[in-house]
Each structure stands twice: as structure tokens, then as C-alpha cells.
């Protein structure tokens, strides 16, 4: 994790992408699938036919933290998971290739 923090360009890309996705999450109304996931998050079980439990956990995380139900809190867990995935993608590209490749990978995925 310190490798990401020491690379300012990577930090700027991560923060910029997170801010952009946050603005989009605040502006768009929930779709049918997100409303379904919200209702689904209140009836947790080990597995369902159509989705694994992580979908319900990531959807219900924001409403559990804040106690509010709106388009941002429904998408909050997904925003965190995607940012974490970008960090892992950057670290993988850095380990396998080089710093410029890791930055380019992060820029493309962001």
C-alpha cells in the first residue's frame, strides 16, 4: 500500500476517478437492478439462484453505515470495492512490469 501512496500520479488518478464516480452516483437515480439489490440486502441468505451474497453486502453497506437510503448509499460499497480493485490492479502491474505500465493500467481502468 505504501507503493501507491508514494506515487503521486497514482493517488491523483485514484482520487480523481473516485470523485468522478461519486458525482455520477449522486446524480443518477437507482435503476431497477439496484432497487432489487437494496431489497435483496434486507433478506440475506448464503446464496440465491441469481446472485451471491457479496452483492447484497456491498449494496447494504452504505445504508448500514449511514442509516440513510438514497442513490449514493446504495452505491457506496461498490465505489469502495472498485477503488480497492484499482489499487490491486496497479500493484499487480507494478510487480509484473514497471511503473509507467502500472500508471497507464490505472489510467485506462479508471
Report each predicted region and the residues it spans.
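Transmembrane-helix motifs of polytopic, lipid-linked glycan transferases
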Residues: 11, 76-98
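Transmembrane helix-loop junction
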Residues: 43, 60, 64, 94-95, ...
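Extracytoplasmic catalytic/substrate-binding loops of multi-pass membrane glycan-assembly enzymes
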Residues: 26-37, 47-73
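Hydrophobic alpha-helical transmembrane segments
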Residues: 7-15, 57, 76, 103-107
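Transmembrane signal-anchor helices characteristic of membrane glycosylation enzymes that use polyprenol
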Residues: 5-31
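Aromatic- and kink-enriched transmembrane "portal" helix at the membrane-lumen/periplasm boundary
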Residues: 22, 56, 67-75, 82-85, ...
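Membrane-water interface at transmembrane helix exits
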Residues: 20, 24, 63, 90-98
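Transmembrane-helix signature of polytopic, membrane-embedded enzymes
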Residues: 7, 89-110
Amino acid at each position: 500500500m505504501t507503493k501507491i501512496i508514494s506515487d503521486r500520479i497514482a493517488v491523483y488518478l485514484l482520487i480523481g476517478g473516485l470523485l468522478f464516480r461519486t458525482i455520477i452516483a449522486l446524480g443518477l437515480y437507482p435503476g431497477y437492478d439496484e432497487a432489487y439489490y437494496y431489497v435483496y440486502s434486507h433478506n440475506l441468505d448464503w446464496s440465491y439462484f441469481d446472485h451471491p451474497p457479496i452483492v447484497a453486502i456491498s449494496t447494504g453497506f452504505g445504508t448500514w453505515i449511514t442509516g440513510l437510503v438514497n442513490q449514493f448509499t446504495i452505491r457506496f460499497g461498490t465505489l469502495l470495492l472498485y477503488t480497492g480493485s484499482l489499487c490491486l490492479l496497479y500493484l499487480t502491474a507494478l510487480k509484473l512490469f514497471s511503473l509507467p505500465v502500472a500508471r497507464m493500467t490505472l489510467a485506462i481502468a479508471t
